Amino acid sequence: MSKKQKNETSAKAPVKLTRAEKKEIQAVIRKYKGDGKPHSAQASIPYEAMYQDGICRVTPRTFSKCIEFTDISYQLAQADTKTAIFENLCDLYNYLDASIHVQFSFINRKIDPKQYAKSFEIRAQGDDFDDIRSEYSDILQDQLVNGNNGLMKRKFMTYTIEADSLKMARARLRRIETDLLGYFKSMGASAWGLDAKERLEVMHSIFHPDGEPFSFDWKWLAPSGFSTKDFIAPSSFRFGNARMFGLGGKYGAVSFLQILSPELSDEMLADFLNTENGIVVNLHVQAIDQSDAIKTVKRKITDLDAMKIQEQKRAVRSGYDMDILPSDLATYGQDAKELLKTLQSRNERMFQLTFLVLNTADTRQKLENDVFWAAGIAQKYNCSLVRLDYQQEQGLMSSLPLGASHIQIERSLTTSSVAVFVPFVTQELFQGGDAMYYGINAKTGNMIMLDRKRARCPNGLKLGTPGSGKSMSCKSEILSVFLCTPDDVYICDPEAEYYPLVKRLHGQVVKLSPTSKNYVNPLDINLNYSEDENPLALKSDFVLSFCELVMGGKNGLEAIEKTVIDRAVQVIYRPYLANPKPENMPILADLHKALLDQHIPEADRVAQALDLYVSGSLNVFNHRTNIDIKNRIVAFDIKELGKQLKKIGMLIVQDQIWGRVTQNRSKGKATWYFCDEFHLLLREEQTAAFSCEIWKRFRKWGGIPTGVTQNVKDLLSSPEIENILENSDFICLLNQASGDRKILAERLNISPQQLRYVDNSEPGEGLLIYENVILPFKNPIPKNTQIYQIMTTRLGEGATV
C-alpha cells in the first residue's frame, strides 16, 4: 500500500473516545466557555469601556454621559421661585424622549475625618496667641463633629442613548448635554459635564464608602495591563445573602421605594438626603412615547369598561341594582379617565420611575439601623421602602451613575409627579483655601466657611437690633482674619466695645476725644490717595463732606459754597504736592485761612462754621497726625467725641483708613474695615455720596469694608442705600424689628420662610446673604472659653483687660 493510500485510510478512520476522555473535554469546554457569571469584582461592574472625554460604553449599543450639578436654596425660597424651579424641572423632563434614559444620583459619602479636620487646624506660631489659636481650633472641631460636614454631598444626572457607533453617540450626547446644562442654568444651579477620570472617581467613592482616596492616571493603563475597572473595584463583592451584600470590609443593602401615596411631597427626597450616614439615592427615569402612553391608558379604560359591564351583568343576574359597582373599579375608572385627560390636554407626559436607596455601614447591625431609618422616612410620606430580595447585585450596579437600570420594578408617573422629587434642598456655603468660619447652617447643621475675597464685591453689612449679636459677629470675624490671614484690620468704634479684643490681640487703640492727646489730621493725604493722577479730586470730595457736617442744615452745601471750598483745597495742598514733607501737610487752620482770603460772603460763611473746630472748644482735629499706626489691628475709639463730633469723627476715621488701604494696595495686602453706626454716614447728601464713592473704591483697592448698624430704617432711607446694597455681596441679618423685616424682605428678596430666622431669633442667629445665596445660620461660641470672654459686651461676662 502506498503512503498516500495509508494517509487516506487513517484520515477516514473514526476516532473513538473513551467515556472518561469525553468528560474531560466537556469539562475543559465548560471552563473556558464560562457559566455567564462574573468571577471577579471587576467583571461585576457593568460597563464595557470608558473614554477620556467622559463617554461610557455601557453595552455595545448603549452610551452614557454624566453631569454634576450644585444644590440651590429651594426649601426656603419664595413661593414664586419654588414654582419657577418646579416648572423648569418639568420642562427638563418633557425635553426627554423615549430614546433617552435619565438617572439622577445623590451621593452622600463620608470622608476621612482626620484629613478633613486638618483643614480647620490653625498651626501654633510660638507667640502670645497660641492659646487662642488652640481654643479657636477646638471650637471649629466641635462644630465639625456636631454638624454633617463629615459627609460630602454630590448630585449627578446621567443620560443614556443608543447608537450604532461611538462617533454617532458622541455627537448626540454633546447636543443633549448643552440642552441639559441650559435647563440647570435656568433653575439657578451650576452644572458641568464630567470627564472619564471624574466619573471613575464617583464610582470609586460608591465602592469605597470609607473614603479611601482615588488614584488614577491614563498613563498607568498600558504598562500595567489594567483596565479602568481595576482602579475603582473594591477588594471583593459578596452577594450570597438575599437581602444584603458585602463590599470590601463593609456591608450594604439596596431597597426600592414603593410609591403608595396618592399625593407626593417635594420634601421626601430632601429628607432621605438629610442624614449623617452615607447614603446613595438613585432615580431612574424612562420617558414613554406619548402616543404609546395614550394608547396604553385607552386600553386600560377599555379593560375597565369591560369589567364594569361584566359586573353589571352579574348584578342583573343576581337581582340587585346594576349601578352598584365595586368601589375599586369605580375609582380606577375615574383615575384612568383623568390621566387620559391630563396626557391629552395638558403639558404632561408619562414616565417609568425606579427609586433606589443604597445604604452602607461597617456592621450588619448599623446597616439594619440605617435601613430602618430610611424606611421611616418613606413611611412618613405614606410610601414603603422594600428591600430587594435576591437582586442586591443588580441593585448595587443600578446605583452606579452609568445610566442603566437592572431593576425592573417601575412606577408609572406623569411629568409633574416625577418632578415632585425636586433634586434641590438648600445651598451650602463651604469654600476651601483661605475660607473663614461664619457659623453653622441652621437648616442642615453644616459649617459655613467663606472667603469674602472671592466674592464679586466683598463689601458687607451687618444689621440687627440691640442685643442681637452684631458686635459679637464682627469680633468673631476680626479674630478669624487675625488668626488666618496676614491682613490688616481697622475698626471705627463709637461705643468703645472692641477694647478687650484689640488689647488681647496686642492691637492698637487710638482714642479720639476733645481732651485726648491723640491727634488725627482730617487733611492727611498721600500720593496714592486716588487712582487718578490727581489725588486732590477725591480729597476735595472728602473736604466737602467734612464741611457739610460742620455747617449742618437740611439742604447741604450750596453750589457756590462747594466752589469756594474746592478752590481753597487747591490752594492749601500746593506746598505739600510740590514738596511732600510732613511739615507741609495742611491742617484745618490752613483751610480756614484759604477761605477767608477769598473775601466773598459764601467763603466767609464756611470759615465762620469752621471757627469752632479751628480755634474753639472742638479743635481736636486742628492738629497734624501724631499717632504712628504700625499695628495689624487698630481700633479708633470715638466714644468720647460726643454727639456734635461723632459723625465728623467717623468720616475722618473712614478717610484715614482709606489712606491705609491705598498704602496696603502696593504691598499686596488686604485691609478690613469695620464701621459701627454706619447709618450716620449716610444721612447728609454730600457725606453719603462720599461714603458711597469710598465704598465702591474699597473693592478695587483690596479693601473689605463692613458697615454695622441697628438703625435699619435710617440706613434704608438713605438715597445712596441702593448703591451700597449693589456693592455689597455679604450681608449678615440678625434679629430684626417687625417693620424692618418687611422692608428688608422687599429689598433683599427674602422669602417668608427665610424671614422666620430673623424674627425673635437668639443672639448670633439670623440670615447670611452671600452673593445670591441666602442661608439661615447660628454662630454659638461656648461661654466657658477665653474667646467668649474677650468678645462679649454683656455686663459681668466680659474679660478684664
Task: Show the residue positions of the predicted features.
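Extended, folded cores of ATP/NTP-driven motor/assembly subunits in large transport
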Residues: 2-424
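P-loop NTPase motor domains
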Residues: 72, 79-98, 109, 271-273, ...
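Hydrophobic anchor at the beta1->P-loop junction of P-loop NTPases
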Residues: 462
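Conserved lysine of the Walker
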Residues: 470
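Hydrophobic positions on the alpha1 helix immediately C-terminal to the Walker A/P-loop
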Residues: 473
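Post-Walker A helix-loop "phosphate-sensing" segment adjacent to the P-loop in P-loop NTPases
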Residues: 480-490
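A short helix-turn-beta junction within AAA+ P-loop NTPase domains corresponding to the substrate/partner-engaging
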Residues: 506-510, 720-733
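Conserved P-loop NTPase
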Residues: 748-800
